[in-house]
Amino acid sequence: MSKTLQSFNLLKWIDENKELLKPPVNNKVIWQDSEFIAMILGGPNRRRDFHVDPSDEFFYQIKGECYVECITEEGKREVVTVKEGDVFMLPAMVPHSPHRVANTYGLVIERKRSQGELEDFVWFCDECNHEMHRVRVQLSDIEKQVKEAIHSFNSNKEIRACKNCGHIMPEEVGEWKCE
């Protein structure tokens, strides 16, 4: 989309672009020339990283439900269910892992990062919750860089092995199930 003073039908845009929503993240930025990152995300996604973003993130769930797994200040995992039609404002710096199941769509808006403003992608052990791996990036292309970080983790057995309990996270990630 170019900078215009015209509205468009978002549901039609999703229908016309849904083939671009591919795992592991299933995201597509709507406008490239904005000071915001406004993107559509579809399910099912295939990710288990936790994103630590220096910006607040606004979630609007268009179809189905989204599950945002967060790490609390006490280090506990907590799942926020964002139901169809709901909005959710995730505060900056909260480690979170958004999970989307099949046939779901949501809009996420966050601000573009300033030069030198870094963010992390972190993996925690499924068994003992120990931090296994962290990647710090200067985010400039959210569609490309998140996929690269996930692929790098998934393809390296050494970093998928927990140094605390020995559990080895599988290379492939199945569809997330809310427990």
Swiss-Prot record:
Residues annotated as binding substrate are 57, 100, 110
Source superkingdom: Bacteria
Report the top EC class in one word: oxidoreductase
Quote the record's binding site residues for Fe cation 2.
125, 128, 162, 165
Please name the SUPFAM superfamilies in this protein's record.
Answer: RmlC-like cupins
Q: Which InterPro entries match?
A: 3hydroanth_dOase (IPR010329), RmlC-like_jellyroll (IPR014710), RmlC_Cupin_sf (IPR011051)
Identify the EC number(s). 1.13.11.6
Alphabetized, the UniProt keywords read: Dioxygenase, Iron, Metal-binding, Oxidoreductase, Pyridine nucleotide biosynthesis
Write down the chemical reaction(s) this protein catalyses. Answer: 3-hydroxyanthranilate + O2 = (2Z,4Z)-2-amino-3-carboxymuconate 6-semialdehyde
Keyword Oxidoreductase on entry: yes
Which GO biological process categories is it annotated with? anthranilate metabolic process; L-tryptophan catabolic process; NAD biosynthetic process; quinolinate biosynthetic process
Family assignment from sequence similarity? Belongs to the 3-HAO family.
Q: What is this protein called?
A: 3-hydroxyanthranilate 3,4-dioxygenase
Species of origin reads Bacillus thuringiensis (strain Al Hakam)
* Phylogenetic placement of the source organism: Bacteria, Bacillati, Bacillota, Bacilli, Bacillales
